Amino acid sequence: MKTMKQNNKNMKLQAMIMAAALTTAVSVQAQNGKYISKVYDFRPAPGQFVNEIPEWEEGDTEAGMIAKAEEQISGGTDNGMISLGGFGGYVVFGFDHRVVNVSGQSDFMVYGNAVYDLVDANYASSEPGIVMVSVDANGNGLPDDEWFELAGSDYNAANTYHGYQITYEKPDPGRATAADPDADDSAIIAKTYIKWTTNSEAEPEGYVKRNSFHTTNSYWPAWISDEKMTFEGTRLECLTVNIAATGLRYVATPRAWGYVDDLPNSANKGYDIGWAVDADGNAVNLPAIDFVKVYTAVNHEHGWIGEISTEICGAEDLHPTASVTEIESDGGIKIAGCEGMVKVQGAREVSVYTLGGALAARFEGDGEAALTPALYVVRADSRVAMVQVR
């Protein structure tokens, strides 16, 4: 079910980065902040905790709700929490520095609120979110460049749907709260509350249901006036089951690794930038990233518990003192990002590009180029590397 997308954005630059077969050494520099410093976007899909976590108040705008989300999840991991609603709802955030891809290690952690089942620890309150990362390729400080999914344990699972698309329709504000109760589940007071349609032939349409535990808030983000919201991404299979002999007791089997709010934080080892893949599933070599996006990855309702909705409590850079610095290839070419410059030894011709693809410097033989602090792509003969100028 994987869709094949034509990606024509920064194709030359991406080809250079993906061709890199160099080993990155990690050095230590001044202490960076460990936790989220900025939330760039917050757009939850409809859900029972929308307008509650964080709380929407009369007059709050989109910018105001983004600021509230930032207040909840920045600066630590226990300041608060946000809910992303149903499938596709997302948040985009960053740190006060680039997060470095340290080879063979988890690079950052995103904290959720999943817990193991009190009776059977094989199950948990899993509501998985997919993680994506991006590099500020155009250098404008905004998350408007290409996104790469971190391929978790279920990326290639048989029932994973790549290119899943869902559209939610805004509910009639005049509709009665308990307009359409579910005769089979007394907790559902409106089983046809918010309609959605998808591109899945197996489940082309359905509803976000209103339950009796959240009756005063709208499940539609109050600061979004659009009549429809569309999200697209990778949909994971719902692993929630009812294990009660009688009645309803919903639990889920957590995935092995790679998803937010799926395993409890104590069992989650974090996220490796080395898992990044492009839209076609090809591995991408990203020595560092600037932005992180998390979105709810399952579209499912489970009775009185409500829709599966990823919750986030914060994120942490697991090695904030790391930086992309010196690289040495098997061919003996040395490339180093230094204070205010790039240095290269052992190459005949050297070209240095910005992440936006513009030529920043060119020289022959051993040499150096004075540059402003940023990440650069360096081509030294047939060798390609991304380095950081401090």
Short names for language-model regions:
Residues T325-R390:
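C-terminal outer-membrane/trafficking sorting elements
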Residues Q31-E127, G152-T321:
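A domain-level signal for the mature, folded cores of soluble proteins
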Residues V26-A30:
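Sec/Tat signal peptide C-region and signal peptidase I cleavage site
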Residues A15-A25:
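Bacterial N-terminal signal peptides
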Residues S134-N140:
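Short loop/turn segments immediately following beta-strands, especially the blade-tip
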Residues L142-L150:
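Tryptophan-centered short beta-strand motifs
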Residues T3-I17:
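Bacterial N-terminal signal peptides that target proteins for export
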Residues F95, V131-V133, G357:
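Residue-level detector of buried hydrophobic side-chain packing
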